[in-house]
């Protein structure tokens, strides 16, 4: 099968199962696997939209303990004997009584050959409706606070009618608003400079007095019993009160001198929010949504002092270990993140500030709990408002697309073992026969807790080939390795759902089987390797990570390219490997591994988004797309991400996922400034100027977070966003000045892709890594 047909096949599998594998044939021995260089891995999107598949309204049929695999199309079913054989542990299981009518021709949906992904609505209802706690920073300008209040009031109409809502505001003090008290505005105040233990928070809020009575049945529309009901009210009952409280919010009254930052106790507000939820709502779906407009400057978790002359930490400070508050703040927020994750609660952080707010220190609050991280200049910006609204997107039945309190378990057949996961989750420390000996990412477990999950949440799951002792019993036909992904989550309709994806791939033949190389998916592999590189970058030095990326690339090319030893001119890669070196070239230069021009908060944000998206979107972040528009061609033409693509009479549209940029070449910019497009007879120029805007609108329409939109001209200051992403094939060191070169000269010492490839070929053919 040729490469294009294979790509279509992998794309169909991704649409059906939400999964892309780095290798679509598994090596049959551990020795063979070690020579692959790129690990066997899957980028899995559990809640990928599947409009055509039915929701099964019954419990899944599972294998006996300890296996617990779910019945799937790969199971052998004996309809006469009413038994099925589990493909994971080969145990025989009786079919339940309600399967008595099945025959070879009438089978239940989960056994249909195309039902490799299926979703069940479980009988177990969620213990409470979804909970939303807004944690609002009041140390901000009037216009910004007003815009934020308007957005929050509007968001109440997007929540499910039975959702519980709470409000905490903070500045110099943290205040928990008692929404259930209607006589007047009433709140509990916590001092911003003091650290409160979980028990203290619960005592001060009176949460320990009655407690939720165990084993009490819950009605879905009623708030749970217990003292927390004073602070968390159902939207449908209390929309008026909540709106009133939000509209009456004032700026923090504490005076701020000109040479000082406002006193902001983000850490105290967060610990109060986590304490409020963990007392009464353990293992219930809830979101703590933090809106901050500046760094924490007092109390636990503060990231900078109140003096303005003391700057926020930079990457340079972190490298030199010149960080006064960093380690203590990280320790505080990480402990908070673990508490929230253990209880199934999500933490989102929305920053509306030109300066850093301490996302670097707080990142694990979001990363451990599957929350959203959003970095904007102000809460007045459309980027914040539109991104925030997208979080509350709904399905055809008017249910929120977000899932709560989610967990993922991976089962494998004896040939495979799971080595870890890289994504927004924490380990559930579950051991099984599927757990491998080595560790990649969050390892030593076969189950993870994600808390928050949405249709684009994607996870990198890594595998190894098990040690097979002695010759395996030869089975007729090709042997298969299998994996099953079980995703449990609380649906916003009030029920628990289970989504099951079962994947089977052939094992390779004897050593040197060509099907192994042909099964390499370079796009999925690049994304899986990028996740490992970013995971390493969190703990290792930057140069060490770059060396690791280079070493792995050289080893892969040495293993799979065709060449004569020590002859770089003979170097050839098969079609399904040719793009991989260029993905690695752009990954090395990307904002995920290079800190130049990025603050630590921005780096934390970019890495967070990379670890959330699927293969297609992640590739756009690693290697942005570039389209060219000109009067000679109709519509857009994809062009190389190269400085040679900049032409005076062309318009370029760059999509980096985080930015969408329209760049007018020199001549086009002059024509536009002269107003030719408004004159009669120049309709084609007007259409040319409009076309990239239309395409940009389409790109923005379904993206989260909303990208920053930039329109610039050749020579303008904003053009730097484009120039920094291009391969510098035309620099001040190539080509003579005054020559007839029409492309842009880039002043940089970075090597070009051509130089990078020359070095790669030289090293690969010499057999040194």
UniProtKB/Swiss-Prot annotation:
Component of the coat protein complex II (COPII) which promotes the formation of transport vesicles from the endoplasmic reticulum (ER). The coat has two main functions, the physical deformation of the endoplasmic reticulum membrane into vesicles and the selection of cargo molecules. Zn(2+) binds at residues 63, 67, 86, 89. The keyword DNA damage does not apply. The keyword Transferase does not apply. One of its GO terms (cellular component) is Golgi membrane. This is Protein transport protein sec23. CDD domains: Sec23-like, Sec23_C. It holds the Pfam family Sec23_trunk. The COPII coat is composed of at least 5 proteins: the sec23/24 complex, the sec13/31 complex, and the protein sar1. SUPFAM superfamilies: beta-sandwich domain of Sec23/24, C-terminal, gelsolin-like domain of Sec23/24, Helical domain of Sec23/24, vWA-like, Zn-finger domain of Sec23/24. The gene is sec23. It is a peripheral membrane protein. It is found in: Cytoplasm; Cytoplasmic vesicle, COPII-coated vesicle membrane; Endoplasmic reticulum membrane; Golgi apparatus membrane. It comes from Aspergillus oryzae (strain ATCC 42149 / RIB 40) (Yellow koji mold). The lineage of its organism: Eukaryota, Fungi, Dikarya, Ascomycota, Pezizomycotina. GO terms for biological process: COPII-coated vesicle cargo loading; intracellular protein transport. GO terms for molecular function: GTPase activator activity; zinc ion binding. Keywords: Cytoplasm, Cytoplasmic vesicle, Endoplasmic reticulum, ER-Golgi transport, Golgi apparatus, Membrane, Metal-binding, Protein transport, Transport, Zinc. Its main location: cytoplasm. Belongs to the SEC23/SEC24 family. SEC23 subfamily.
């Amino acid at each position: 099968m040729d490469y294009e047909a294979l790509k279509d096949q992998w794309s169909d599998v991704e649409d059906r199962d939400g999964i892309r594998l780095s290798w679509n044939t598994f090596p049959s021995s551990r020795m063979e696997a070690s020579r692959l260089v790129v690990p066997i891995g899957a980028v899995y999107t559990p809640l990928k939209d599947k409009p055509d598949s039915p929701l099964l309204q019954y419990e899944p049929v599972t294998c006996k303990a300890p296996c617990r695999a779910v019945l799937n199309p790969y199971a052998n079913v004996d309809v006469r004997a009413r038994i099925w054989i589990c493909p994971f542990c080969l145990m025989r299981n009786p079919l339940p009584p309600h399967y008595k009518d099945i025959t070879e021709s009438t089978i239940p949906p989960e056994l249909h050959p195309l039902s490799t992904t299926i979703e069940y609505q479980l009988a177990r209802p969620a213990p409470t409706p979804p909970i939303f706690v807004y944690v609002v920073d009041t140390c901000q300008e009037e216009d910004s606070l007003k815009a934020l209040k308007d957005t929050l009031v509007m968001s109440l109409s997007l929540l499910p009618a039975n959702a519980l809502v709470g409000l905490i505001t903070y500045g110099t003090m943290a205040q928990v608003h008692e929404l259930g008290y209607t006589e007047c505005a009433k709140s509990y105040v916590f001092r911003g400079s003091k650290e409160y233990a979980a028990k203290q928070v619960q005592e001060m809020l009176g949460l320990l007095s009655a407690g939720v009575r165990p084993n009490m049945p819950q009605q879905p529309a009623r708030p749970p019993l217990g003292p927390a009901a004073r602070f968390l009210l159902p939207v449908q009952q209390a929309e008026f009160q909540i709106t009133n409280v939000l509209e009456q919010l004032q700026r923090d009254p504490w005076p701020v001198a000109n040479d000082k930052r406002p006193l902001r106790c983000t850490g105290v507000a967060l610990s109060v929010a986590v304490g409020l939820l963990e007392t009464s709502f353990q293992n219930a779906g809830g979101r703590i949504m933090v809106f901050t407009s500046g760094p924490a400057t007092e109390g636990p978790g503060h990231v900078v002092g109140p003096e303005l002359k003391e700057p926020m930490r930079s990457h340079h400070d972190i490298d030199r270990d010149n960080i006064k508050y960093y380690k203590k703040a990280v320790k505080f927020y990480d402990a908070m993140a673990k508490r929230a994750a253990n209880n199934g609660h999500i933490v989102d952080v929305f920053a509306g500030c030109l300066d850093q707010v301490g996302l670097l220190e707080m990142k694990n609050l979001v990363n451990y709990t599957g929350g959203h991280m959003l970095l904007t200049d102000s809460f007045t910006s459309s980027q914040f408002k539109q991104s925030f609204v997208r979080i509350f997107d709904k399905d055809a039945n008017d249910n929120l697309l977000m899932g709560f309190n989610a967990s993922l378990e991976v089962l494998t057949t004896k040939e495979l073992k799971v080595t870890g996961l890289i994504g927004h989750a924490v380990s559930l420390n579950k051991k099984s026969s599927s757990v491998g000996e080595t560790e990649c990412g969050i390892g030593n477990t076969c189950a993870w807790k994600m808390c928050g999950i949405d249709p684009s949440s994607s996870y990198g799951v890594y595998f190894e080939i098990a040690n097979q002792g002695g010759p395996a019993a030869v089975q007729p036909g090709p042997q298969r390795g299998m994996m099953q992904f079980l995703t449990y989550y609380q649906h916003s309709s009030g029920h628990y759902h289970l989504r099951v994806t079962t994947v089977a791939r052939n094992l390779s033949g004897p050593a040197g089987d060509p099907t192994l190389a042909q099964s390499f998916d370079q796009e999925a592999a690049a994304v899986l390797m990028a996740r490992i590189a970013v995971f390493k970058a969190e703990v290792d030095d930057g140069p060490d990570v770059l060396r690791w990326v280079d070493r792995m690339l050289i080893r892969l090319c040495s293993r799979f390219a065709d060449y004569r030893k020590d002859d770089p001119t003979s170097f050839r890669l098969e079609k399904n490997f040719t793009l991989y070196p260029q993905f690695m070239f752009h990954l090395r230069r990307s904002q995920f591994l290079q800190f130049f021009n990025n603050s630590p908060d921005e780096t934390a944000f970019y890495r967070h988004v990379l670890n959330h998206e699927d293969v297609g979107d992640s590739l756009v972040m690693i290697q942005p797309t570039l389209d060219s528009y000109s009067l000679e061609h109709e519509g857009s033409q994809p062009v190389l991400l190269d400085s040679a693509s900049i032409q005076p009479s062309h318009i370029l549209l760059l999509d980096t996922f985080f930015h969408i940029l329209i760049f007018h070449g020199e001549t086009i910019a002059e024509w536009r400034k002269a107003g030719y497009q408004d004159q009669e007879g120049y309709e084609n120029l007007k259409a040319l100027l409009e076309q990239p805007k239309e395409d940009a609108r389409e790109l923005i329409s379904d993206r989260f977070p909303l990208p920053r939109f930039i329109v610039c001209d050749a020579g303008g200051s904003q053009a730097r966003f484009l120039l920094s992403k291009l391969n510098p094939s035309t620099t001040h060191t190539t080509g003579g000045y005054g020559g007839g070169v029409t492309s842009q000269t880039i002043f940089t010492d970075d090597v070009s892709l051509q130089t990078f490839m020359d070095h790669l070929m030289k090293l690969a053919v010499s057999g040194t890594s």
